[in-house]
Structure formats: structure tokens, C-alpha cells
Amino acid sequence: MEHELLHIVEQAKVLPKLLENRVKDPVKGITYPQRYIFILLQKYLKDFFKEGAEPRMVGLAGLRGVGKTTLMWQLARYAYNNITTNIWFFNVNSLMNLGYSIQEALLRMEEVLGCKLNVYDKPIVFLFDEVHDDPKWAKTLKILYDECRTAFVIATGSSALLINQTPDLAARMKVEKIYPFKF
């Protein structure tokens, strides 16, 4: 069991090929369009890593299929090309399906990184897709925010759950609502 989770965490490291695959249509090979909100989210990333500005935890909330995950990957590609290659992606639905929580994955992250997250001093980006699938997601992300001060966190999830988060996390996470494209 422990080796399985360690393997999952090791595979969570984002590599260039994965980034390119996630921002393009798999059949047509065309890069997905960027939303206007990308510019604001890009600014959050730049400002945190350049000046230490808040927010450093962003929730992308919206209906299923509106493009939250694609937007997250577009931000990851920007961060990879301009800020840090130290980016980690966790599909929380898959983690939970295998019987693991976000907290368990983060504990294994410490093994992979070679130190506790509360003393980690390099720029790092965490991507959590479908974060609401973990019942303890809000508490876990609050702890991650408080302990890993060099981390920028992007989480996608259900509108209702992200918007109605715990009061502790509400002060830490900036929730951006993602709406369907209009044609």
C-alpha cells in the first residue's frame, strides 16, 4: 500500500510532455483557447513568486465540463515556462478511488522532496483536480497553506463546495467562478 502511494506521488511530478498534452485537443492537436480570467490568474502566480503577494491559493469553481481543469493546466504551463518546473498534479478523484486522501499524498510528498513541507524553501506549485472528492479537502489545504509558505496552490472543484468552504480556508483561498463559454 505505502509503495503504491509513493509511486503515485512520484508520478505526480509535471513534465513538459504532459503539459503540452493537457492544453491541446487530443484529436485536432489545436491548443485550447485561453479565457480572459487566465490573465488575472497568471498575475496571481507572478505576484506571489515575485513579491510574495496574496492570494497564493486559488480555487476554480464551476459546473462540470466548463474548462476548470484545462484552465488549471494552462496556468501550470505558464508557471513551468516562466517561474518553476517544480509542479505537482493530483487528481483527487483518482486518489480517493484508490483509497488515499490528499493528506496522505502530501505526507508522501515529504519523502519525495526529502524534507517536511513546513521547512521546504523552494518555489512549488500544487495542482489539485476535483478537490471536493476528499471529504477533508478544506482542512488539508488550510494546513498545506499554513505550513508550506513557498507553495502556490490551484484547486478545481464543484461550485457549491468551493464557495461554501470552511471559514478558516475562506480567508486563505481566492475562489474564481468559471462559467461556460458563450458562443
Where are these regions (language model features)?
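Phosphate-binding site recognition
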Residues: 1-183
